[in-house]
Structures are given as C-alpha cells and as structure tokens.
Amino acid sequence: MNKKKILLLSDDLRMSSGVGTVSKEFVLGTINHYDWAQIGGAIKHPDEGKAVDMKDALKEDFGIDDGYLKIYPSSGYGNPDMLRSILRLERPDAIMIYTDPRFWMWLYQMEREIRSQIPIFYYNIWDDLPYPMWNQPFYESCDLLMNISKQTVNIVKNVRQNKPVEDWQCTYVPHGINSD
C-alpha cells in the first residue's frame, strides 16, 4: 500500500529554529506512515533553488529505510509559482502549514485553487488572548486545524464564526518534543 504524501510548509526541518525542530519531529515521528515533501523556509537560505533528497540521511542518521523526504529550500516561505511546481512534481495528498499564518498570505490568496484538489491543514500555535480576529480568514481557509493547546482550540472556535468547525476539523494536538 502506498503511503499518503504531505507537503509541509514551515521552517526548514534541518534548521535549529523552534518551528524547524518541531517540523523535524512531525516528519520523523510519522515517516513510517506518510511520505513527506517540504518547502523549507529560512532567511537567505543557502540551499535555495535546490531539491534535497533526504533518503540517505534518513537511513544513515535515523535508521529509516523506507522513508521519503524531499526538501525544497526557500529564502522566506515560498511563492505561488514554487508551490504550483512542487504540487505538480510531488502530487501530495495534503498541505500542512506550520508557523504564523500571516507568513502565508500568498498561500491563502490561492486557497480555492489548492482546496479544489487537496486539503490544507494548519498546525496552530496561537494561544494568547485577546482573540486574534485578524486570523479569521486564515482559519476559515483550512480544512483541518490542529491546535497546540485547549486554549488554542477555544480561540479557533471563537474566531472562526462565519464558518464554524466540526469537532474533527478543530483538534487538540499537544505541542512538544518527543522525549524518546
């Protein structure tokens, strides 16, 4: 059986940022169940324009024989043309974004184009009040909102008023690093 493929849009998982570190945990923790591609963002990314096949690194560094991970480095977080090209090449089953949604303005401007083909998932780290009403259009443009805390679930449900979510669309996925 072929594994589903997820296109992750976040900080490059090889980088040491908090978002990069948690992105790495997502991928390594689920690579036996999913194939992964990533638009890996960084400031002035040294590998921009390359496609980095991580198959050998997965095997050598983590003992993973059947994992698929390809990183498309980007200075910043990509753009519509880059995304369209990667969607054609990788043919993912879903997109998952992770970081402040305001970094993805270009993505949300093309959400209908994307969601007509595949769903958009958002791992949401917003847990501070007051309610970020400016995030309403971002939350409403996602098919699944995975939230780091019960407070974040509360925020999403109070902000996403025009298009209320079903329970399965707004889940609690605890934030943290695998201690194993």
Model-derived regions, located:
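Extended catalytic core of nucleotide-activated donor transferases of GT-like folds
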Residues: L8, V52-Q151
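Donor nucleotide-sugar binding/catalytic pocket of nucleotide-sugar-dependent glycosyltransferases
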Residues: D143-D180
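Glycine/Thr-rich phosphate-binding loops of Rossmann-like dinucleotide-binding domains
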Residues: S16, M105, I155
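Hydrophobic residues at beta-strand termini and immediately following loops
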Residues: I39, Y72-S74, V173
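Short, glycine/serine-rich, charged loops/turns that create anion-binding
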Residues: L13-R14, I43, R102, D127, ...
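N-terminal subdomain of nucleotide-sugar transferases
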Residues: M1-D56, E90
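Residues at the starts of beta-strands that form the adenosine-phosphate
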Residues: K5, D35-A37, P119, D143-L144, ...
